[in-house]
Amino acid sequence: MAPRVVIPLDQNWEFRQADKPDSKFLPVSQFPTNVHLDLQHHGLIPDPFIGKNELLVQWVGEAQWTYRTVFAAPPVPEGARAVIAFDGLDTFATVVLNGTTILESDNMFLPHRVEVTSVLKAEGNELVITFDSAYLRGCKLVEQHPNHKWGCWNGDVSRLAVRKAQYHWGWDWGPTLLTCGPWRPVHLEIYESRLSDLYAETVVDKSLKRASVKVTAVAERRADRVRFDIALDGQQVATETAELDATSGEATVSFLIDSPALWYPVRYGKQPLYDIRATLLAGDDEVDTLSKRIGLRRAELIQRPLEGQPGTSFFFEVNNIRIYCGGSDWIPADNFIPRISRRRYYDWVRLVAEGNQFMIRVWGGGIYEEQAFYDACDELGILVWQDFMFGCGNYPAWPALLESIRREATENVKRLRHHPSIVIWAGNNEDYQYQESEGLTYDYANKDAESWLKTDFPARYIYEKILADVCADLVPSTPYHPGSPWGAGLNTHDATVGDIHQWNVWHGTQEKWQNFDRLVGRFVSEFGMQAFPAVKTIDAYLPLGRDDPDRYPQSSTVDFHNKAEGHERRIALYLVENLRYAPDPLEHFVYCTQLMQGECLASAYRLWKREWRGPGREYCGGALVWQTNDCWPVTSWSIVDYYLRPKLAYFTVKREMAPVSIGITRRTHLHPRDRHTRVNVDVKTQIEVWASNLTLEDLTVDCVLKAWDVESGEETFSETVAAALLLRENRSTEIAALDVPVRQKNVGEEGRIVVAAYLVDKEGRQMARYVNWPEPLKYVHLQKPRALRAQLTADYSAVEVSAEVPVKGVALECEDDGVRFDDNLVDIVPGEVVTIGVSGAGKDTKIETRYLGMI
């Protein structure tokens, strides 16, 4: 029997506007592709990311487009078949081969395999794909189902009827760009038999000393046997051959591996990946091969009663290690997905890992990501929370749509289930919150799934029946969570169960970020604060760059590149509550917004990680900042902008998620001297100090506190407040509570005292530092720094920063994008040199500084 032949159909593609008679075919820009990329390549539309060009290209999403190619095919042997495999068509596609319609597709997330044996020719095979407007088709579907209670946040309700990336309709951080096209590969296969699936079910003993691996291969059409090989680092671990079951077409073998090489999250161990390979045999002929990379690990979601607080925990345990899942939420890295390279995916995930993050959540309004994304997470040790693709709306549930969703879920879980990084599947993003806000029917006690379809919230059937069943069948050892946020059918804002999205800073009640300790949940899977992107990024989207007349923060073009409703008021609110700032120059305004974001996010991580208090007291098991990234150049909640330029908050999050950190909070208490007076009131400002040890070793440290007068730079206090302090592994430890150290009480001196806390090991090495300032910072009389110095070391590997008075938020800047800093936005106090690692610097590198109060 001849081996399977796979021929990529990635050459000679052309496209044209199908509903415009005089439109000519033009070559595509790349393959896979989409229509915006191809139109832009030929200069037929402007770059939608520049200026307000998004408005000029809206017609593209309402037009009809045709793609075609012509290819030759090898002979199809007797008894063999020819199949064209479409890995992804976006979205409403009619596929015609040599004049015969072979496929009608209406789901962007579904791969298709179509037998074309009887239609294929040796030469001149014409493959034509016509794409209808997803927006217009969606509008028609809405009209055809008037009894459904249509409604959503973000975009247009037509998106709810269409199985397509929901952010293409626009979101509060992204443009409306309704793409279409063959967005994933297309190839021709000729075979008598092939392997259609390969998967492994792994179980690691609680002792971690042994792992069982059950590997199953599924064959399509007749063959005899499958040879299974497992290798690690190129060395064979096991091999075995099994007969194919004549009925199911499956062959299964089980391996026991003693002393397995276990896969760990970043910082807790290595990420060894076993190669499993299946070879399909017909007699002595090797007919087909299929391989996957897997990791061996125990991964559990722990939801159990807590000591001293109501509700249940929500945290992840990997290889018996409790993981505090600090991390971030991922959106698609571009509006035009086909141009995201494998290298770019890796660079994004590497930034996450280098930022001391453990988890990334693939948000439910984008796509089931490319293999390159999950491969990078596997290799770098990043845990993945994977949403299904539903978000912020009341989805309909007619029978054909439900069947399409069932197939979508099945295909994508099968495609991704081998990745050790994926530790949870979640049914949707904020659809239960939408149900609550609109008063849609939801009775958690009612377990009659068919009855859910008759309510005004029929999507419950999708989340609690279809997706739950698919996951139970295909990934029974991976937790399934019906939504995010969700907690056992209780209100999605209940902080004592499940996960929450904490948007009462920015959205909601618009709390001060200093109150994040009162806004904690068992697992906070969204929270955030906006900041402008790098000035270079702004210049890149302004039509005239640095010379553009709209190069100021409140301009219509800059405003256009922020899609959040009410963003002007909210950015202004948090700036004016906290900082002295001015809109000019643009560079310093951008700095102020990034300082604001950095302070906000650091506050959340610092205060919430304090609630990781040890076994049985995991009051907060993780926090995922909204959001990791952007899909275009924009002002948003991201901590790294579209061009992979980290905002300053990236570094404050990195510091707070370091293996060892220290935190301080200030609390002001008013004490009347008798019951009735409002005159004689004592004001006491106290600080609380704690440390976080996320390592797996107990540490013995000294805690040193120092204080300075911010106006004079004079050191006013220096004391070891805890000597030989034991920091137990993987938890926070309370250290001290004391009054703010002042020279004279009851004269308001607390408002000018900066307090720094240090953890020092027995060799005198500094393990952690944190500088606490009076807040709000706008009240502090910041001084122009004396002798502020930021100098490259002789070998250009670091920058040394120092000053003679306390300086808030020193940011290092360099015009050269090739120069990267290991840390940034640091607070400087007298008598200390802060060393920041740098890469890409040389003798001509010029480092500049920016700080709060310089303007």
Curated annotation (Swiss-Prot):
Principal location class: secreted
Entry keyword set: Carbohydrate metabolism, Glycoprotein, Glycosidase, Hydrolase, Polysaccharide degradation, Secreted
Pathway terms, separated by semicolons: Glycan metabolism; N-glycan degradation
GO cellular component, one term: extracellular region
Temperature-dependent activity: Optimum temperature is 40 degrees Celsius.
Catalytic function, reaction form: Hydrolysis of terminal, non-reducing beta-D-mannose residues in beta-D-mannosides
The protein's name: Beta-mannosidase B
Primary gene name: man9
